[in-house]
Amino acid sequence: MILDVPLPGIEPWEEVKANPVLWHVGFHQTPNVPEKLLAGRQFVNFREGIFHRFTANSRSITDADVTHYVKSYAAPTQLRAGMEFYRPFPANEKFNKEQQSPVDVPIVLAGGDKAFGQLIPRMAESLRKNGCTHVTTEVIKDSGHYVVGEQPTIVAELIERYASI
């Protein structure tokens, strides 16, 4: 299950990359800089820079939730690991664009209706064109990017529904 993220190299990836709202992707890919600028500022980064901007209802993520994220990224190695999620995107983009072999593994694309959920049909079509034979889509209502925090019951139900496919 892929939850509310665009996939590098899978359409509409070029559109996603060009979206100025997603400036943080390039920032996080920059070696060493985000770690230095964000160290000690994780709470403000998560509360104002991330959750306030990318949730349908920023109050769905409490200060206690933010504190949990802050603790998870408190150590320099943890903060670096968080940035490393973004750094292979260029290589992933190249790989995914070149992928044409059949892929029979079931894929469930799910996204928040106020975030990447609107791109899900185009992503599914692109995956099918690239050889993925079993793609299912779901749009999670009243949710932004942080679908697990915003709609935990719905996400749990989706996982239970699709876990056996």
PLM regions: where:
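Catalytic histidine-centered segment of alpha/beta-hydrolase-like enzymes
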Residues: S143-A156
